[in-house]
């Protein structure tokens, strides 16, 4: 399936590059504000070095997830890692066989594509397009170093022919960096995503928590590695 899937990628990227390069895509500002606000986050797991919290999103059946940790690490290094979509496949090791690719780049944002195999019987794989920005989501957002949101599904049917994947179009995320002391920064990744399909909500919430923690760990590990190499 993986080889067959790649067969369509070059066609998809050519089509999507022309589709999204000049298109205006509205941001889910209401969702971003809910992720940004510090209120109503409830600690889910504090047993490890990463603090994991959840938040009920009004009108939604699923929870937003946040993972955070205090580190002695420059913000720009973390930002560069998160924006490095071309190398996600190399350093997001905990995500297994997830496929990530950059499909369009401008001076303001990058458009990316991800394909996520679901290793469960009778459940479809997942895929989505996303737009990621190296800054806050609004003018007075001084804490977000990166924000992203899912894009509508133009062109994704080219991939569906090979994978029968469920396309995701409801989700967004923020990477936070807040100074807490000299040379200490609290980094957090806050995300809400609805993977759609027929997965039960409790399983979706569990998958989301695990996925967010793994992405956070892998991204921070890569940032620490790059920082050591520079110094």
Predicted region positions:
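Sec-dependent signal peptide recognition
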Residues: 3-11
């Amino acid at each position: 399936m993986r080889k067959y899937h790649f067969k369509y990628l070059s066609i998809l990227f050519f089509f999507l590059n022309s589709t999204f390069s000049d298109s205006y895509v509205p941001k889910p500002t209401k969702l971003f504000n809910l992720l940004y606000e510090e209120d109503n986050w409830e600690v889910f797991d504090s047993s490890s070095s990463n603090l994991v919290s959840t938040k009920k999103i009004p009108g939604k059946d699923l929870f937003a997830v946040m993972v955070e940790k205090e580190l002695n690490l420059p913000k720009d290094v973390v930002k560069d890692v998160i924006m490095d979509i071309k190398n996600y496949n190399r350093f997001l090791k905990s995500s297994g066989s997830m496929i990530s690719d950059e499909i369009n780049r401008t001076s303001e944002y990058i458009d990316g594509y991800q394909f996520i195999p679901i290793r469960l019987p009778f459940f479809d794989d997942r895929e989505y397009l996303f737009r990621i920005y190296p800054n806050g989501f609004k003018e007075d957002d001084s804490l977000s170093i990166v924000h992203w949101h899912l894009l509508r599904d133009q062109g994704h049917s080219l991939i569906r022919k090979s994978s029968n994947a469920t396309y995701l179009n409801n989700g967004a995320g923020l990477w936070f960096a807040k100074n807490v002391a000299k040379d200490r920064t609290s980094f957090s990744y806050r995300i809400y995503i609805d993977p759609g399909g027929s997965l039960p909500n409790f399983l979706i919430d569990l998958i989301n928590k695990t996925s967010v923690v793994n992405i956070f760990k892998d991204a921070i590990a890569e940032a620490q590695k790059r920082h050591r190499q520079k110094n």
